[in-house]
Amino acid sequence: MARILITSALPYINGIKHLGNLVGSQLPADLYARYNRGRGHEVMFLCATDEHGTPAELAAAKAGKPVADYCAEMHAVQADIAKRFGLSFDHYGRSSSPQNHALTQHFAGKLEEAGLITEVSEKQVYSNADGRFLPDRYIEGTCPNCGFEKARGDQCEECTKQLDPTDLINPRSAISGSTDLEVRETKHLFLRQSAMRDQLDQWIDSKTDWPVLTTSIAKKWLHDGDGLQDRGITRDLDWGIAVKKGDADWPGMEGKVFYVWFDAPIEYIAAAGEWAEAHGKTDADWERWWRTDKGADDVKYVQFMGKDNVPFHTLSFPATLLGSGEPWKMVDHLKSFNYLNYDGGQFSTSQGRGVFMDQALEILPADYWRWWLLSHAPESSDSEFTWENFQQSVNKDLADVLGNFVSRITKFCRSKFGEEVPDGGTWGEQEQTLIEELSTRIGAFERHMEAMEVRKSAQELRAIWVAGNEYLQSAAPWSVFKEDPERAAGQVRLGLNLIRLYAVLSAPFIPDASDRLFAALGTEDRSWPEDVAAALAALPAGHAFTVPEVLFAKITDEQREEWQERFAGGRSA
């Protein structure tokens, strides 16, 4: 039995996430967690809400709530939606937890001891009207390059030119619109990533099985231009983790907090501490997952994220762990995803364009979405959600292939043999051929799942469903029954056992449907089919079952058109 630690990129606290966010991290991480649990491995699957930074403060202000209250409320909302989507976290934590405060301050102290933190004076824009320093992207003005009037202080979205806030013509606060801005000097702490460039380079080179997408992004940041730059790890904000060296104050850093991208990945570790506390466990129970001197040396650690998060997870977070000089578990495999686009454009939170997780569950159960998203995961390139493709995939794969097989075999058995597994008949050449095909395909399915090849895994699972349909079509027990009821009984018994096999293999993708199949079959035998022939005899003659309700309803053209119009844009923020 292996021990597998899985983390998913933390969803930001300011609002409900769309399906593009879901498929880029949490959903494939859940797929991998469920698969490994199904294989009998010990899994720790952690995630949390990312709660610090300017956007959280602004979202709270817009909602008219104290930021701590807003974050607590939105954490509960996101946790509930995650649960309803079947995301099987062992713990869903919060980056604002006491554990993350203590651990972030601990790491900062260790990095300072190692000489990897330096203090830098820099000039930043201060808004007198807002009473705060403004991050670059909260300053708007006219682009000096192309004249676009809503360029941000870090980049013009129109011409893509990189900018500094002082480059903008007629700059104003994006929060209040005020032009009462001034440049003030402020001091911040920087993590000396440049001093660790060679160490990080060697570490990334050792990861020979990482996706090209992941390593190419990391290498670009390491070597392009002037190479890996030092990174500011503090901010002038009220909400966040106070800057300290462990338990001690940090002179000159009073009133400042750690930058959200410094503390957020540390929450992966802190979430394990939260898990231990929530379950009445000891520090040793979570440290065996994260400290290689306390039992984590045999752990396989896998991270899931969108490609925009790769630089922080391949460079900044490893720099924090390696730089601390302590024996923390480093990531073994980093699975990154491209973007999911929406119906000819992009998902847009601000414009309400696309389907958000809460809305998705209002119109269809989670399994419909899980299947489409995972079978179309944006792995080697960006992929696109269209309503036509969604309808086609649900209707063909889920309703026609899997659902139809379950319905046909259970209803036929009920009509000819009653609601129990029939006795009689032996396997012949057709059955042996099916067993050989399934053995080959399940082996391929396992290899794809272990390699985290999400789309290929879904394709192989669908082919396994198709094999059962093709067997049923060629065996034709409804015809055989007229001449040889015994042989038909053997075919039906195999078909009913195929349903159990499908429930086991499909559980990581469509867990609710899988549970319904187990319930209909009256079994909790979820054992993995190491031996396909034995798996197809798991339900013995005389075992009672019930015919399940329709497993997946087809999506009508009218529904598709209605939803396409509804989610074209205009969601109220």
Swiss-Prot record:
Binds 1 zinc ion per subunit. A motif ('HIGH' region) lies at residues 11-21. ATP binds at T349. It catalyses: tRNA(Met) + L-methionine + ATP = L-methionyl-tRNA(Met) + AMP + diphosphate. The keyword Lipid biosynthesis does not apply. SUPFAM superfamilies: Anticodon-binding domain of a subclass of class I aminoacyl-tRNA synthetases, Methionyl-tRNA synthetase (MetRS), Zn-domain, Nucleotidylyl transferase. Its cofactor is Zn(2+). GO terms for molecular function: ATP binding; metal ion binding; methionine-tRNA ligase activity. Its EC number is 6.1.1.10. CDD domains: Anticodon_Ia_Met, MetRS_core. Monomer. PANTHER family: METHIONINE--TRNA LIGASE, METHIONINE--TRNA LIGASE, CYTOPLASMIC. HAMAP family: Met_tRNA_synth_type1 (MF_00098). This is Methionine--tRNA ligase. It comes from Ruegeria sp. (strain TM1040) (Silicibacter sp.). The gene is metG.
